[in-house]
Design a protein with these regions (language model features):
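A general secondary-structure boundary signal
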Residues: 6, 31, 45-46, 72, ...
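Non-globular targeting/processing and membrane-anchoring segments
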Residues: 98-105
Length: 105
C-alpha cells in the first residue's frame, strides 16, 4: 500500500503503521532483531514493537484492540474507529478500494 497510496502518505492524509506483536517466543523475537529485520527489508513506514508486561498473558496491543494473531490487518478510519479487521488472508484489491472509499468520505 505504500506504493498505491504514496501521494496520500506524502500529503499526510494517510498513515501506514505496523505493530510487531509477540505472543510467544519472546526471547527470540526481540526488539533488536525487529530493528535488524526492518532495516534489512527497507520498510518505508513506522514499525512498533508491542509492549508485553510479564504479568499479562498477552501484549498490550492485543489486549487493547482485541487482535488474535499474526498476520492481522486493521484499517482505521478518520475518526479512529476500526473499519476493518481480519486475521490471515484478505483480498488486497478489495481493501485497497475500501481505503479509497474511506478517504473519499
Amino acid at each position: 500500500w505504500e506504493k498505491d497510496f504514496a501521494q496520500e502518505i506524502a500529503d499526510d492524509r494517510m498513515k501506514i503503521v505496523s505493530i510487531h506483536t509477540v505472543f510467544e517466543g519472546h526471547r527470540h523475537q526481540s526488539l533488536s532483531r525487529l530493528k535488524k529485520f526492518v532495516k534489512a527489508t527497507g520498510f518505508g513506514h513506522s514499525v512498533g514493537h508491542d509492549r508485553h508486561d510479564v504479568s499479562d498473558e498477552y501484549p498490550n496491543t492485543m489486549i487493547l484492540y482485541g487482535t488474535r494473531g499474526t498476520p492481522e490487518v486493521a484499517i482505521i478510519d478518520k475518526e479512529g474507529l476500526i473499519a476493518y479487521q481480519r486475521i490471515g488472508f484478505f483480498d488486497v484489491e478489495e481493501k485497497t478500494q475500501m481505503i479509497r472509499d474511506l478517504m473519499a468520505a
